[in-house]
Amino acid sequence: MNVVTAIGNLASDVSVREVSDEHKVANFLLAIDRPSKDGGADFVPVSVWDKQAESCERFLSKGQRVGVDGRLRSRSWEEEGKRRTAIEIVANRVEFLSGPREGAGAEEVFEAAAAG
């Protein structure tokens, strides 16, 4: 079973790009507080697809609190002769837990289209 739920704050603004004529992907970095005396946070990349990607771009900005439900995906690539690996959350749902960015409209919850 590959299921993840996380709550945190956006550590970056949302960036959206078209990956084909029919699909868009939004990416942002989620800062998730560590439950320890030392504190700190883990910074996890999040990918959101299609209609929800557009909603995230419209309503979210750095610093806002969100809840994310989705799955983990690992990626590997070569960079300067070295093998690199990254793990990201592919979101099925993003819940906006703090108000929308200024001028964006009412707080809303969006379900992601099953893409990615």
Where are these regions (language model features)?
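Short aromatic-glycine-enriched beta-strand elements
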Residues: 17-32, 85-86
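The conserved catalytic core of RNA pseudouridine synthases
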Residues: 38-48
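Acidic, gly/ser/pro-rich intrinsically disordered tails
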Residues: 1-2, 14-22, 37-39, 54, ...
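C-terminal structural segments of small proteins and small subunits
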Residues: 75-100
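OB-fold and OB-like beta-barrel modules that bind single-stranded nucleic acids
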Residues: 5-12, 30, 62-73, 91-94
